[in-house]
Amino acid sequence: IELTLMSLLPMAVGWVIILGLMAMLGIEFNIVTIILSTFIFGIGDDFSIFIMDGLLSEYKTGRRMLDTHKTAIFFSAFTVVVGLGALIFARHPALHSLALISLFGIVAVVLVSYTVQPVLFRMLVSSQTEKGGAPYTLGSLINTLYAFGLFVTGCQLLQALIFTLWPLPMARRRKQRIVQWSIHHMTRGFLRAMVTTKTIRLNDTGETFAEPAVVIANHQSFIDILVLLSICPKAVMVTNGWVWRSPVFGRIVRYLGFYHAADGYERLAPALAQKVAEGYSVIVFPEGTRSADGRIKRFHKGAFYLAAELGLDILPICLYGNGMISSKRQPIYIKHGLVVSRILPRTACGDPADYSAQAKSACRQMRREYRKLYETYNRPCNPYFRDMLIKSYTYKGPVLEWYMRVKIRLEKCYTLFDRIVPREGTVVDLGCGYGPLSYMLAMLSDRRRIVGVDYDAEKIETARHSFLRRPETEFVHADLRTAELPEADAFLL
């Protein structure tokens, strides 16, 4: 249905242009002009289908066919314009008006097909896959609009609450506490309301947040902020500039006394001391920015400086899955998946003179814990992987897409293969076809090197041209009877 809508939109725009030109030129809208306009609309239908076919051919295999299609459309339109446009020299007024409608209508339809359709396709599909993300579908657009609509509504309610509390005769810190309590419960409600995600919270230590601490976490997505605010009932956060200046929630974080990292941690410590005295924890992302691939980057020393200056424990929280649901590459795209958080044991702040060693030690601990979550939840049971695998074959033909949907369901998302194939090493997939098993195994473990081999050149071209492809994934067109296969830890046949 998405391709149908993308093909119909240029025709609808062309129809509006034709009607507008008729009104501007004073051409009467009668039965003759209606029939002619419908005829032009039908020609535009063919042009849109040809343009879409060229776009899909390039998207599926990488072969550029759009220029050839545009050339054919140009000569077809030129023939129609010359044939019907010749009527402009007729002396009869009706024939003259028919010629004008034909001339302007065909030109409008061609221009719209040449411009609107490729721009729309690039915006929703090819530009997303070029940066390693999934293409938009109607379902994903609805899900994303639902999530952001829910989020914006919550922010508006919080701003209304702040406005309502403003004239009341009570201390500002009490008002802030009311807003903080509201945020804590609203973020919990938001995560529960996300129908395409499942929230898993692991608190093996029984942490209650009764005592303030410097809470540190790995950073993958803006969802991390919502998750931490839903976990910590009473906390302020050290944020980046984009959070501070956000037109949606910037006013809220400023009202609550959140702090800007650009101010410098030396200046933040005295300001945060008052909040800590009131029982607030301090949330810091030591990486300083979101990770694009989920890997935990080097920790900066600011959080550990604050812990030493304020006399607080370090409380690590390891997050998994947020970067899959809303990645740095595609922040305005909400996907299926798991939101997992694990609260780790507190550690006392160490020697104030050695922040660097503390940061390195905390980073190593976070990477170990993240790897444990990765090995537990980077499995076929995580709905993210099935969703991404199906989306990698979306818009590559209805037969191929539905074949993959059925095959993935029958194979139970390749759970058996993931269980018996080593999670580290080289895996050769003989007769890989379009590559669904190869891509699933590659997604489930970043330590696998996958080599897919198949005799069908078209299938290999399709497999190679996927947004899931990574440097560790290779597809080879070869005859299995004569192919030189690499040494591998597992062969799949």
Language model features: what each stretch is:
Residues I51, S97-G132:
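Transmembrane alpha-helices and their membrane-interface boundaries in multi-pass membrane transporters
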Residues I142, L268-T394:
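Non-catalytic C-terminal accessory region of glycerolipid acyltransferases
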Residues I162-S182, F209-G264:
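Catalytic core of membrane glycerolipid acyltransferases/transacylases, capturing the structured
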Residues P436-T473, H477-R481:
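Class I SAM-dependent methyltransferase SAM/SAH-binding core
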Residues K60-A90:
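Pore- and gate-forming transmembrane helices of large, multi-pass membrane proteins
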Residues G133-P212, K391-K407, Y414-T415:
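Membrane-anchoring hydrophobic helices of lipid-metabolizing enzymes
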Residues E424-G433:
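Conserved class I S-adenosyl-L-methionine
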Residues L3-F50:
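Hydrophobic transmembrane alpha-helices and their membrane-interface caps
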